[in-house]
């Protein structure tokens, strides 16, 4: 996870390649708490983070917003009492790019 979390996102254009099945297997192994979901034919990374209350969940959400702005890559975020569901995918390519794994690792680091 640390290796990915230290990487920088690269600009992802509409013609950027999605991760291959081999890359997916290698990258997902580095972020074992994340799952792969498919919604509307679009592969996405998703993880639920647990908190003791809503205030802590909201604080994490706000820190994640700052992280996303700094890296110019933005997740889906659902903040509820005691949990935050984070979903990463690359909108421009309608699927997964290495950036999504980088940001998932950075999100894990933020949570620690």
Swiss-Prot record:
It comes from the Bacteria. Its EC number is 4.2.1.96. One of its GO terms (molecular function) is 4-alpha-hydroxytetrahydrobiopterin dehydratase activity. The keyword Metal-binding does not apply. Keywords: Lyase. SUPFAM superfamilies: PCD-like (SSF55248). GO terms for biological process: tetrahydrobiopterin biosynthetic process. The keyword tRNA processing does not apply. InterPro entries: PCD_sf (IPR036428), Pterin-4-alpha-carb_dehyd (IPR050376), Pterin_deHydtase (IPR001533). It is an enzyme of class 4 (lyase). It catalyses: (4aS,6R)-4a-hydroxy-L-erythro-5,6,7,8-tetrahydrobiopterin = (6R)-L-erythro-6,7-dihydrobiopterin + H2O. Belongs to the pterin-4-alpha-carbinolamine dehydratase family. PANTHER family: PTERIN-4-ALPHA-CARBINOLAMINE DEHYDRATASE-RELATED. NCBIfam families: PRK00823.1-1. HAMAP family: Pterin_4_alpha (MF_00434). This is Putative pterin-4-alpha-carbinolamine dehydratase. It comes from Shewanella pealeana (strain ATCC 700345 / ANG-SQ1).
């Amino acid at each position: 996870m640390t290796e990915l979390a230290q990487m920088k996102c690269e600009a992802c254009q509409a013609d950027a390649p999605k991760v291959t099945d081999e890359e997916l297997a290698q990258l997902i192994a580095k972020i074992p708490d994340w799952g792969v979901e498919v919604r509307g034919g679009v592969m996405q990374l998703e993880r639920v983070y647990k908190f003791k209350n809503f205030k802590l969940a909201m604080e994490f959400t706000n820190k994640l917003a700052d992280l996303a702005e700094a890296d110019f890559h933005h997740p889906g975020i659902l903040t509820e009492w005691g949990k935050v569901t984070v979903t990463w995918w690359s909108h421009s390519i309608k699927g997964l790019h290495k950036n999504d794994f980088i940001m998932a690792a950075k999100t894990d680091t933020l949570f620690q």
